[in-house]
Amino acid sequence: MSSTAASSTVGGGGSSEISGVKKTSKRPKYSRFTQQELPACKPILTPRWVILTFLVAGVVFIPLGVICLFASQGVVEIVDRYDTDCIPTSSRNNMVAYIQGEGDKICKRTITVTKAMKHPVYVYYQLENFYQNHRRYVKSRNDAQLRSPKEEHDVKTCAPEDNVGGEPIVPCGLVAWSLFNDTYSFSRNSQQLLVNKKGISWKSDRENKFGKNVFPKNFQKGAPIGGGTLNISKPLSEQEDLIVWMRTAALPTFRKLYGKIETDLHAGDTITVLLQNNYNTYSFNGQKKLVLSTTSWLGGRNDFLGIAYLTVGSICLFLAVTFAVLYLVKPRQLGDPSYLSWNRSAGGLQ
């Protein structure tokens, strides 16, 4: 009896230990989410729903298109191309040599205001056939150098405009080197129209991308000179022409803000523009234009958005009417088994 009891005790202890071991399994924890068993709604695109969807889209998009188009048409815009007219007739056979010469390049232009323009009137320069999105051009800069004076020697990404005589260029790179340098001054009836150049750049760029203690060094001291110069006594965060230029454009035709005229211009006014035709667009067959423009709640003049809304809305409305006519003329019962392939006649046989 004692041996039996002992063996029973040992056996009992063993089974207790085995039952205490936690069983492991590679089976993932059950969840209705992971097993895709959550309740779901699966809408069926019935003819009525399709017609209603297209109808609603057309009714919404067409008025939006009309509103956007009216807003765009309300913008008054004057565009004056001057790159060819500002070259003397005797130099038009070799415009590159003229623009690279040392002579004075003052040009006088006259602009007539055809429709009243309420202030502020935005002054833009427009360049065409200028690829600021070229990979080599875009990479030729150092954003860290623009923010901190500690990074002024980090110019390895700025070649070929990285240093002059071993000294770093600040700001370095082709983007800064090619800074636009045509200048404009305006007058009306012999009275000067002041151009406000404060606040023409993005506030986020001024505060975050250009340092308040970073000053130009050795800029445009090499050869050849690419574009405009900078004031060495002003930090980069205050040189807004540079900040505007450094925000590169995605397309070869682009506008950049030059300044704002804080005076109303009346219909029939004659604006005299004295400009310095300095920037070389002739080497790459580019164009230069001066643009005066007002704005609307939608921005500058751009008919594309309104036309796009009208086009899409008209297509949706046309499809809604077409489907409605087809549904009324030749209705089809939803889920009709006679339309199944095995229920259709093949070659006239059932």
Curated annotation (Swiss-Prot):
InterPro entries: CDC50/LEM3_fam. Glycans are attached at residues 181, 231. The modification N-acetylserine is found at residue 2. Residues 1-23 are annotated as: Disordered. It is a multi-pass membrane protein. It is found in: Golgi apparatus membrane; Prevacuolar compartment membrane; Endoplasmic reticulum membrane. One of its GO terms (cellular component) is mitochondrion. Expressed in roots, leaves, stems, flowers and siliques. The keyword Endoplasmic reticulum applies. Keywords: Acetylation, Endoplasmic reticulum, Glycoprotein, Golgi apparatus, Membrane, Transmembrane, Transmembrane helix. It holds the Pfam family CDC50. PANTHER family: ALA-INTERACTING SUBUNIT 5 (PTHR10926:SF50), CELL CYCLE CONTROL PROTEIN 50 (PTHR10926). Belongs to the CDC50/LEM3 family. This is ALA-interacting subunit 5. It comes from Arabidopsis thaliana. The gene is ALIS5.
